[in-house]
Amino acid sequence: MKKKIGLLVMAYGTPYKEEDIERYYTHIRRGRKPSPEMLEDLTERYRAIGGISPLATITLEQAKKLEKRLNEVQDEVEYHMYLGLKHIEPFIEDAVKEMHNDGIQDAIALVLAPHYSTFSVKSYVGRAQEEAEKLGNLTIHGIDSWYKEPKFIQYWVDAVKGIYNGMSDAEREKAVLIVSAHSLPEKIIAMGDPYPDQLNETADYIARGAEVANYAVGWQSAGNTPDPWIGPDVQDLTRELNEKYGYTSFVYAPVGFVAEHLEVLYDNDFECKVVTDEIGAKYYRPEMPNASDAFIDSLTDVVVKKKESVM
């Protein structure tokens, strides 16, 4: 009989329906309810992208496809997938409890975010391991980052190339690629967090692979707090690159995210497009990885490598 291994897939989570927005936002704010204005602002953003984010559906599809693929590519162990979310049910702790109840003793934990940071990956894996320690007899092996995974980089190289191949030579010369991820509070840099460096590296790999000479790194979706967040913000960067270099086509690759969701569909497709429209430039954004075969293959390699290194 094959050994059963837990596959703990973790993600941020998103409201399932409009009525969930307040409790979701309250959880993000560590139990403090948002003001009516803040709640209205977030609700309006969801309405602007069609009422609710497709993220919940995509995350589940990614996790299920990954489990299926892992069980197809090898025959030594049987992977059982558990989904754990940071800010809405099924919570990370609930997924760990379920694993424990199912008699799983070893699990690989994968966060659906390619870059490591103390704010994201470390906190997800930390929550899972803490719960596993409480329950006993369950070891969770966390994956720190997978931004260098060749098939992940290749996904974005192909996606970016696809956009540039549709341009004329003249347009290509005046085009710039903006590679971005979710901003985090600036204080993480002083703490030696590798997050910004990993995004810069990702941008270099993608630009090199796609043979794009003009590119820049930007940050997006910063939180509404008094602390300074990492910049430049993608909207400011767009204006600056247009003013400084006269770029007239902007290609946005939000590589810190893995799916179409609010931060991409609103912060990129709406807010960045407002800026490109304002300056008379063209807006492009490649399709997100979502549950594409190429992306699932890259995650499969990540999990298999981790399993081989720890078991």
UniProtKB/Swiss-Prot annotation:
It holds the Pfam family Ferrochelatase. Keywords: Cytoplasm, Heme biosynthesis, Iron, Lyase, Metal-binding, Porphyrin biosynthesis. Its EC number is 4.99.1.9. The keyword Ribosomal protein does not apply. Its main location: cytoplasm. It is an enzyme of class 4 (lyase). One of its GO terms (molecular function) is metal ion binding. Fe(2+) binds at H182, E263. Pathway: Porphyrin-containing compound metabolism; protoheme biosynthesis. It is found in: Cytoplasm. GO terms for cellular component: cytoplasm. It catalyses: Fe-coproporphyrin III + 2 H(+) = coproporphyrin III + Fe(2+). InterPro entries: Ferrochelatase, Ferrochelatase_AS, Ferrochelatase_C, Ferrochelatase_N. PROSITE patterns: FERROCHELATASE. One of its GO terms (biological process) is heme biosynthetic process. It comes from the Bacteria. Fe-coproporphyrin III binds at Y12, R29, R45, Y46, S53, Y124. The keyword Lyase applies. Involved in coproporphyrin-dependent heme b biosynthesis. Catalyzes the insertion of ferrous iron into coproporphyrin III to form Fe-coproporphyrin III. Belongs to the ferrochelatase family. This is Coproporphyrin III ferrochelatase 1. It comes from Bacillus cereus (strain ZK / E33L). The gene is cpfC1.
